Amino acid sequence: MIIIAKTINYTQEQSIICMKAVEITDIYLQSFADKNTNKKIQYKINDKWFDFDGIRERQAVLPDSLFSRYMYSSLTRIKNSDIYSNFLTVRTSYNVTYRDHEGDKKGVPVSCNDLRNQYYKDGIDYTFIVRNRKGEEIGKITKHFVMLMRNPSKAKKGECIFIEESLFLKAIRFLTMGLYDKMKEQYENAPDTLFNIVGMSAYQTLTTAAAGDGYIQIPLNNILIIKDREVLSDPMKAAVVKSVPVQYRKFEIDFDDPKVEKIINRHDCTFDPETAKEKGCTLIGKSREDLSANGIRVNGKYPGEYHYVDDEKRKQCTVVRADDYEIPNILWDGQGLCDSSIMPEGAEGFIYCRSHFFKSCLFAGNIQEFFKDYCVEHGIDYKTATTEKTDMFKRKLKLCDIKAVISDKSIKWLKFVDLMGGKESKTFRYWRNFMKEHGNWFEIVKTVHHSKLGEYQKSAYQMNNSVPSTDRSILQSVANCSIEYYNLLKNNDAEYLKYLEMMKNRFNINEVLLAMVGWNSDFTKTELFREKKSKDLNKLKNEMMAGRLWQKADNLTIMDNPISMLLTAVGDKAPLNEECFSVMADGVQCYTPKFKDGERLAAFRNPHNSPNNIIHLYNVYPEKLLKYFPDIGENIIVFNAIGTDTQARLNSQDCDSDFVYVTNQSELAELARIAYVEYPTIINAVEEKGVSEYHFCPEDFAKMDNAISAAQISIGVSTDLAQMALSYYYAGKMKSRELEDIFIILSVIGQISIDLAKKNFDINVVNEINRIKRLSCMKSGLVPRFMADAKKIKNPKKKYSEGTVQRMNCPMDIMAEIMEEETIQYPDRVSRMLLRDLFDKDLKKIKADNRKIDNLVELVRGYNDTMKDIRTDYGLDEEDKAYYELKNRVLDKTLKKFGRIDKDGNTNLDQIVVVHLTLMAMRDSNSDVRNTILNFLYQMAPELFLKCFVKNEQK
């Protein structure tokens, strides 16, 4: 089914679509309470019972995207609210036990899996409260919602989006390009048919990604599609992870032993036909099944012996080491190239684009210049040259019209050829027509964004704890950059002001402090400034000691062999001979303008589990890359993926905007070389089970999401478990092959857990993790100090059993000790003064409307409470885009109220109000809201705010 799209203006800004967010357990408890209005419903957390007071409503956002713009005209906003009543975010994050009377000590348990099954099948009835401007209830709206899609960025938290039933078909047909209808029709005609709903559920959400950097329109006739290419490395060391049947001990009865005949004779049975005739016994076969069928129990009295037997239904991982393994790379997996002429204003280096069943990272280069030069060198007429020999679908496109080149890995609809016509050519036409109907628009999910930390970038504890050394002098050098930077900030206010500039945002007080110091340099002596600096540096040191070390480094987006890709595009006979890189024995050649020609580099990619994932790089400056990709900038790195192991080495890396943390720190570069040579590259050889395990029905969608949710949790668990195994390995002087196997296997388990949203594998990741936990070398459960500290920074409520957390002789704990010893404990003494000492004394005499001041202070308190709720109740990480979208929305609404203009044209913030709010903020009783008040005043009335204080020359 092709959907006729109405014209959408993608150049116009669209407001955020806000929706209610609820827990599925609250929905269930509310429905139970509605049926039992005369009973008090309670639910249990740990061992304590709580009264159920109704559904806890939060807010979520549907970001600006192709999907949200398509749906926008059909959406309805609740009166006097910015909440839309057409979507409902539902989190399935915990099981619940409830009861309807206090005498019930155990309660009734209900699992997330059961609730998914119920609500995916039956949908959800949800009631919205309508309020007037005073917040008073004036009505209710009840709507029926049905499951639409998993939230791709929140799969780990078990989050999905339900949609108003009347809009379901419009939405699902857009998301699936009409393939939903085709699947449904096939299912109704043949209910036993199995479908790739795993892939469909993953790829239908591509048009829902936030268009953080706008949109771009590229006609498909300007896009050349080539087939990717598998290339093999030179023979090298590898650690191959395979799945093998779980073995168990099985007792095999020796049925030929005369003792067995005597035992069964007592039950009037026999194996001997003659005995059966003579004594009238029942003749049975020699098997356990025959014994059981005749009521004969098997116990320890039977003769026989134990054997190890394979259980073909249960698999576990094993590591097989090889010295001459040819490791495959898939060239240009998710990568595309675009001519620099089509790069949108403000975009740099690349544009990561998504559209209908499409995602590709388009790197900017002079591709038309390359085509011209190639044609001249090979005697081809550039203006008439066509692409029917190189285009995957044999399209005869003019080479001079090509604006982008992509590989087939970027087009995900190839996985559904059977639904789209049965042939790839028909499938392409289906996609082309759908894209044309919707204007050939692509959302730009991201482009290059430079580090706000300037020449620095933070690393992660997973990286630092994997470097293959426990030598204190070497690790001292690795930690020195962080130590020196911290000490510089400690005793240098000018450097700390630069730090404030780097870390400023709309929500903190950094910009206020910078403005105040610019107004009067004595502000650096105030308690406000000194306390903020002390708090910031304590936080910085704690983060560093927990693994967030600073290095002169950056996160660089990966591109593979673009010259080879262009040679393939023009049909060159030897496209792998691009004359850019050489194969090295102890590393991989690369090109990035970020570092100098000839420098050695260390690179790490997230997810990162072990030294087997570290890559050693040699930076070179190939002439062809300098000529045809002159503007890629310092945030892109070109890998040589031909004849190397880059993708497996970097934990299943591809080129659809994957990035690596890269540094030229000399000790890290040498440790990377050692790791690359001594720790074999991990190969994920666990077999896929196929994709067609499910029927096209709500119950199977729930079954799939239950499995995916369980596996997603395993991503973090496998990473943590790998760090524990790695720490034990280093503490044991790097000798245990068993521990080495564990962090190798867990690296693969992490890969599989991520891919389970799209594929099925011949291993149960939860069972495998539990098996590893039970191994004798892991049973202690000891947690290295740095790891416990990192967890507590993220979740201050995190607790460990007494004696569980220990300092270990592992790289990160050693570096944390070094930092504790080498960092300055106490800063140089500075004379302090109170903030009120710098206040303009003449302004203190002005009288104000105290009621208005009190109302504004309470508004600020409410804002602070809401901000805490967003982090704690919503379970969002600070890096989460939704976290900032929600925070921005709350801040904008509060600032609007804070500086509101009344019907007479009077603003809340005149000089009198600003003066007295500033005085209120300086009171000790208002220390909890001080920073927020000052931040609001500076954002809304910067000049009036600064005039509250004396300038330097007025002293």
Give the location of each predicted region:
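Beta-strand-enriched accessory nucleic-acid recognition/scaffold domains that flank the catalytic cores
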Residues: 1-633, 637-652, 659, 663-955
